[in-house]
């Protein structure tokens, strides 16, 4: 045998042997803030759903509490994990998200639904190849600690409620951290639009009525009973908690190691959907603006990243002396804002128009806009 032939055979032989590193290569996470590190809105949320309709309460960045026809009260918190007590800590996680039952609902209505959820843009889920014969299966892995033992569900929902696939996992021991992996079957029938609109939701069932729990695990479909099959009621007692950490959704039928991002990288991803430049910090200059009247100033606000779409704007905690948004002239004369609205907005910037009572300054004067209190919030939202 020639030397060249021997080398060629050796190379071919070597190429067919998968290395351990390749076999264990971690997959990219389709979810954002799966480690629950970013919390621009705050770290604790008291939630009282409207029992007559659908509510989505955003909590830690990218995560919301989905409540449909639910009539009970909850507190959602970012928890700090501790070594020696919380097992996810040993795997690099420092935070979790917890839903605490404040007012119990022992018997939810037949179609009541309470779930912890995240929505994904269509252009971010194209790697699943849904709607094609080569569609990919995927795996969700996470840590869970629930007071209520028994069957729980992870559901992948086509946004708008047009079909779902649900998989079960079990909480074996009450209030104990356990690790779960579930494999989501490929969807060969439905193509998610390749746009910035919502295409898929991941939902962790918390409390669900009998209409949606009476079935069994199944491939993609729209049978009501298979939405959260066998889901226990985590909110039937005020002593109950529902807590998860380290959530990863990736391509393939096996879970791989969670890829921990630096905080800045995760924050940049979150800013596409929500931005609060204050985040509870007082005495913060926001921008300078030009007066358009003696009671109005306009400022151009440039977002730190391009947002998913033109955002909505909300000003929180304003209008009381010493507690809110303040406008100040160079001379020191100041006024407290009574309103703030967007007069124009796109995905890169907005014009913020701020008004106050009582004439201060004059047209074309420059005014400084700043927060004078830790409770002041300026919130731009382009959530799905």
Predicted regions and their residues:
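Extracellular and organelle-lumenal recognition/adhesion modules and their flexible linkers in secreted
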Residues: 3-384
């Amino acid at each position: 045998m020639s030397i060249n032939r021997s080398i060629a055979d050796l190379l071919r032989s070597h190429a067919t042997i998968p290395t351990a590193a390749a076999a264990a290569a971690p997959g990219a996470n389709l979810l954002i803030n799966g480690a629950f590190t970013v919390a621009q809105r705050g770290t604790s949320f008291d939630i009282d759903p409207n029992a007559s309709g659908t509510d989505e309460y955003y909590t830690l960045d990218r995560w919301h509490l989905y409540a449909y026809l639910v009539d009970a009260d909850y507190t959602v918190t970012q928890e700090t994990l501790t070594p020696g007590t919380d097992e996810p800590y040993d795997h690099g996680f420092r935070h979790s998200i917890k839903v605490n039952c404040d007012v119990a609902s022992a018997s939810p209505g037949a179609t009541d639904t309470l779930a912890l959820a995240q929505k994904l843009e269509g252009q971010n889920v194209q790697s699943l190849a849904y709607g094609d014969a080569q569609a990919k299966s995927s795996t969700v892995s996470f840590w869970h600690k629930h007071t209520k033992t028994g069957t729980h569900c992870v559901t992948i929902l086509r946004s708008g409620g047009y079909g779902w696939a649900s998989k079960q996992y079990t909480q074996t021991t009450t209030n104990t951290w356990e690790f779960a992996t579930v494999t989501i079957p490929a969807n060969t029938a439905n193509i998610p639009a390749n746009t910035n609109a919502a295409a898929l939701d991941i939902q962790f069932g918390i409390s669900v009525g009998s209409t949606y729990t009476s079935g069994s695990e199944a491939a993609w479909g729209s049978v009501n009973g298979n939405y959260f099959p066998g889901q226990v009621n985590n909110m039937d007692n005020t002593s109950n908690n529902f807590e998860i950490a380290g959530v990863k959704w990736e391509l393939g039928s096996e879970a791989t190691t969670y890829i921990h991002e630096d905080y800045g990288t995760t924050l940049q991803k979150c800013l596409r959907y929500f931005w609060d430049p204050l985040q509870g910090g007082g005495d913060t200059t926001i921008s300078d603006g030009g007066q358009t009247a003696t009671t109005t100033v306009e400022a151009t606000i440039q977002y730190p990243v391009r947002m998913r779409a033109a955002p909505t704007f909300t000003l929180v905690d304003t209008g009381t002396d010493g507690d809110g948004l303040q406008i100040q002239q160079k001379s020191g004369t100041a006024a407290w804002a009574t309103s703030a609205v967007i007069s124009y907005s796109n995905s890169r910037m907005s014009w913020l128009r701020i008004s106050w009572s009582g004439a201060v300054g004059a047209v074309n004067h420059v005014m400084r806009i700043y927060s004078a209190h830790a409770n002041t919030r300026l919130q731009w939202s382009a959530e799905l």
